[in-house]
């Protein structure tokens, strides 16, 4: 019935085309030369009211109703006209029938379903909005025992699931068999949503159904739904120890599938950790492998230790070939430790830990070696630059980059407004299904941090945080201060070798031999300072050029071809106002009243008018003309 009912909507036209394709290019050319003819208006006069409703012939529908047809009269299968209008998303006809007194919750068809059930099954958000505005009850069950939210979850109609919950439907509403929308989505839908959306809106992953005693995770495992399993285990921390009526737990079910390619590596790590017995947990090796806090501290300590041991190798008075052999052994040891103890998440901490270790040994080297070789003024300048570096680093590391944090009420308001606009704002370019927020212009969802950030620049592993609206200026300060600190280390190290070892730097090879014979530790630290200085120079130049000259972020520069407001400008930033004004806007400070920053609330700036350079909308939702968002995850620099 559903397939036949939707035939009119899927064909695209109620009158099939009668023209035949030309047999050769000459016929095509002759046809192309004919003047265009006006489209022929389809003749609906022979349609009965059911067919007219299915095909959207509202004029014919009005004619038949005005002639006395009862809009609540069902057909032989107890299906009403409102059912046919709903399943074909004929919104004008739905409005007309409701005005004429159609029963909004009429039950009919093989499944004893309401028009709202029919519209939901086909994913017609517009029809659902109209029916619920007229008082349709989404909690009514059909013959299969399912309410509308269960049907929407089964067919992956994420926008409908969100709309039902925003309108007050309990996300944990159970059908006749005790199945929740989360269970149905985990069982039926292999995509990320609506499982993620349901969890974000408060669905309980611990609920069990009446028939089997399964949780949503049980159902996901039975369906081999790797996406749902990963989302439930890693995002919602669903329990692996809940037994169903057969005594099976998600842990035992996953253990029986060990080695299966459809189970993600992170999920299997979680399974192995949960499978440890209490005796295994007490062993030192097990603690090292499975104690996350201990592994985290081991990860942090490794760069500190490796830096020190490598420096000691350079200071050993032996042949260089032996030194290189020792360095190779040192690398093998730490590489083996890393593979055994560190997972992908912990490896993301490596750049931050390397930075902290390098800076810590900078301080030790300056105080123990360089301080006596330089002036008091040089030490003070080094410490001042270091203090400023710490301020900028902490603001970049622990500061809020501009995270968009909606409340539950704001999320519901966003969903309802988007839905009642016709659902035109649910596109990934304008709506984040992970955070359930409308995306302000220049914002982006960072998959590393799993959050939307206003005026997103990039995710920086060297500070372990996103760089966005509220910490971008501190990040720029971090780069400049780090550059200055590295320069001071090179200056101090050269002074140390000149004063303590009489090294002459006009002869490079001779200077390197003298450094190795005198004190290789300071040379090792100088080499690290030079290495860090090289990439910091490149990054600082790139960031400064983008901010001042281009007036765009790293994300915008890499993905400008995906944004409509950049396409309209031929790839140039529509936000640039010239180098001086760009700098003033970025720093948000005035220069003795000569120039004033243009203060824009990027947390709530949603659209850009390329003609007037003004915001045309500052409501909490995106319009259909919003810029395209990027589909990638994040950028590392």
UniProtKB/Swiss-Prot annotation:
Which Gene3D superfamilies does the entry mention? Ankyrin repeat-containing domain
Membrane topology, as annotated, equals: Multi-pass membrane protein
Where is it mostly found? Golgi
Q: Which residues form the DHHC domain?
A: 430-480
One short Pfam name that applies is Ank
Catalytic site residues? 460
Could you tell me which cysteines form disulfide bridges? none
The molecular function terms in GO held by this entry are: protein-cysteine S-palmitoyltransferase activity
What keywords appear on the UniProt entry? Answer: Acyltransferase, ANK repeat, Cell membrane, Cell projection, Golgi apparatus, Lipoprotein, Membrane, Palmitate, Repeat, Synapse, Transferase, Transmembrane, Transmembrane helix
**What catalytic reaction does the record list?**
L-cysteinyl-[protein] + hexadecanoyl-CoA = S-hexadecanoyl-L-cysteinyl-[protein] + CoA
A Gene Ontology biological process noted in the UniProt record is:
synaptic vesicle exocytosis
Q: Where are the ANK repeats?
A: 77-106, 111-140, 144-173, 177-207, 212-242
Name the Enzyme Commission number(s) assigned to this protein. Answer: 2.3.1.225
Kindly give the InterPro entries that the UniProt entry links to this protein. Answer: Ankyrin_rpt, Ankyrin_rpt-contain_sf, Palmitoyltrfase_DHHC
| Membrane-spanning segments | 296-315, 319-341, 346-366, 374-394, 473-493, 521-541
Q: Which residues lie on this side of the membrane: Cytoplasmic?
A: 1-295, 342-345, 395-472, 542-637
Role of this protein = Probable palmitoyltransferase which is required for photoreceptor synaptic transmission and for the correct expression and localization of palmitoylated protein Csp and synaptosomal-associated protein Snap25. Probably palmitoylates Csp. Probably also palmitoylates the dorsal-ventral patterning protein Sog and promotes its secretion and activity and the stabilization of the membrane-bound form. Required for synaptic vesicle exocytosis.
| Domain comment quoted from the record | The DHHC domain is required for palmitoyltransferase activity.
Q: How does it assemble?
A: Interacts with dorsal-ventral patterning protein Sog.
Q: What is this protein called?
A: Palmitoyltransferase Hip14
The species this protein belongs to is Drosophila melanogaster (Fruit fly)
């Amino acid at each position: 019935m559903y397939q036949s009912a939707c035939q009119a909507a899927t064909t695209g036209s109620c009158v099939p085309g009668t023209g035949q394709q030309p047999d050769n290019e000459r016929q095509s050319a002759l046809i192309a030369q004919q003047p265009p003819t006006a489209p022929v208006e389809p003749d609906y006069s022979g349609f009965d009211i059911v067919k007219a409703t299915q095909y959207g012939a509202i004029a014919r529908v009005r004619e038949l109703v005005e002639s006395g047809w009862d809009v609540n009269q069902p057909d032989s299968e107890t299906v009403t006209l409102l059912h046919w209008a709903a399943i074909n998303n004929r919104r004008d006809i739905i409005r007309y029938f409701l005005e004429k007194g159609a029963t909004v919750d009429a039950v009919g068809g093989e499944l004893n379903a309401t028009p709202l059930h029919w519209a939901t099954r086909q994913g017609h958000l517009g029809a659902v909005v109209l029916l619920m505005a007229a008082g349709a009850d989404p909690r009514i069950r059909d013959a299969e025992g399912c309410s509308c939210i269960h049907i929407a979850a089964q067919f992956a109609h994420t926008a409908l699931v969100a709309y039902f919950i925003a309108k007050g439907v309990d996300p944990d509403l159970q059908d006749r068999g005790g199945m929740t929308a989360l269970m149905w989505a985990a069982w039926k839908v292999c995509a990320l949503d609506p499982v993620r959306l349901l969890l974000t809106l408060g669905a309980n992953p611990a609920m069990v159904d009446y028939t089997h005693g399964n949780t949503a995770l049980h159902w996901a495992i039975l369906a081999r739904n790797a996406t749902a399993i990963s989302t439930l285990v890693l995002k919602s921390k669903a329990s692996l120890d809940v037994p169903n009526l057969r005594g099976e737990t998600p842990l035992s079910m996953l253990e029986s599938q060990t080695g299966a390619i459809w189970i993600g590596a992170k999920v299997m790590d979680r399974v192995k950790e949960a499978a440890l017995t209490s005796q295994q947990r007490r062993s030192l090796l097990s603690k090292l492998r499975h104690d996350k806090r201990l592994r985290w501290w081991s990860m942090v300590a490794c760069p500190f230790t490796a830096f020190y041991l490598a420096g000691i190798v350079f200071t050993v008075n032996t042949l260089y070939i032996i030194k290189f052999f020792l360095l190779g052994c040192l690398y093998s040891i730490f590489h083996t430790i890393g593979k055994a103890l560190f997972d992908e998440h912990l490896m993301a901490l490596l750049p931050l830990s390397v930075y902290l270790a390098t800076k810590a040994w900078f301080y030790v080297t300056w105080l123990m070696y360089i301080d006596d070789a330089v002036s008091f003024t040089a030490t003070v300048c080094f410490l001042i630059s270091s203090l400023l570096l710490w301020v900028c680093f902490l603001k970049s590391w622990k500061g809020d980059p501009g995270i968009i944090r909606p409340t539950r009420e704001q999320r519901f308001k966003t969903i309802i407004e988007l839905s009642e606009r016709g659902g035109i704002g649910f596109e990934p370019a304008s709506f984040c299904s992970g955070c359930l927020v409308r995306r302000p212009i220049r914002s982006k969802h960072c998959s590393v941090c799993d959050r939307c950030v206003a005026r997103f620049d990039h995710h920086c592993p060297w500070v372990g945080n996103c760089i966005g609206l509220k910490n971008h200026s501190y990040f720029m300060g971090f780069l400049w201060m780090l550059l200055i600190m590295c320069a001071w280390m090179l200056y101090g190290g050269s002074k140390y070798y000149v004063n303590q070892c009489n090294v002459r730097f006009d002869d490079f090879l001779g200077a390197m031999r003298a450094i190795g014979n005198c004190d290789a530790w300071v040379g090792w630290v100088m080499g690290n300072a030079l290495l860090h200085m090289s990439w910091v120079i490149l990054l600082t130049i790139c960031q400064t050029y983008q901010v001042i000259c281009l007036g765009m972020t790293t994300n915008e520069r890499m993905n400008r071809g995906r944004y409509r407001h950049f396409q309209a400008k031929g790839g140039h930033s529509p936000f640039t106002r010239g180098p001086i004004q760009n700098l003033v806007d970025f720093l948000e400070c005035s220069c003795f009243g000569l120039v004033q920053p243009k203060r824009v609330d990027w947390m709530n700036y949603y659209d850009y008018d390329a003609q007037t350079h003004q915001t045309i909308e500052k409501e909490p939702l995106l319009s259909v003309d919003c810029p395209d968002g990027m589909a990638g995850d994040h950028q590392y620099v």
